[in-house]
Amino acid sequence: VNDLTPDSGNEVRNADTLEKFFEGTDVEIARYESHPGRVSIVVTVPGDPEKEPLTLMGHTDVVPVDEPKWTKPPFDALIEDGKLYGRGAVDMLFITASMAAVTRKIAQEGNPGGTLAFVGMADEEARGGLGVKFMSEQHPDAFSWKNCLSETGGSHLPGALGFNVGEKGAGQRRLHVHGDAGHGSTPYGKDFAILKIGEVA
């Protein structure tokens, strides 16, 4: 559970599970620890370097729970009436598990075409400082960032298929502009600061 502190998350447990899942397959496995217990895992199925690579990236952390508000045990992965209940079942461990299963299947069958990588990334729920940011800054060549598929997040309507081409985030800036004070009733011919900041923003 990632409570937004560096010592939480403990994604090493999921990295261990994923590494065991790939035992006996012809893959390359690398682990990257950004902070004690905060492990991202990269599983690579080597392919033809002349062909396009593909990276499947899923995160392995989940957010905390307010357990009294849950009607099912949040960490038991309970299957009831064909439905899986648990923290992370929707965001996004079901996608991460599916990506791992597809990668293992392709590794077992061989010949992926281009190189296929599966990444179980730590620290997505806390903006990725110990996950994607760490990997991009400290280990940018651990896998191909080109043709990288990840989550769309949350739940969707049945039959809906969502695609994101980017990720929104906070980018706070302080802008200073200088101009004349004025009144909205006489806007013409004035050097209004609000007009300048509108052009910048």
Segments (PLM) and residue ranges:
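Fold-independent oxyanion-binding glycine-rich loops
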Residues: 32-35, 58-60, 81, 121-122, ...
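Extracytoplasmic/secreted proteins, especially bacterial periplasmic and envelope-associated proteins
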Residues: 13, 17, 134, 196-199
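Acidic/His- and Gly-rich active-site-bordering loop/insert found
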Residues: 1-87, 106-113
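The feature captures the short pre-catalytic strand/loop hairpin that immediately precedes
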Residues: 172-185
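Acidic-enriched catalytic cores of C-N bond-cleaving enzymes acting on peptides and small amides
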Residues: 140-141, 154-155, 165, 184-201
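Soluble non-cytosolic domains of exported or imported proteins
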Residues: 5-13, 93, 188-191, 195
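Acidic/histidine-rich catalytic neighborhood of metal-dependent amide-processing enzymes
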Residues: 84, 90-166
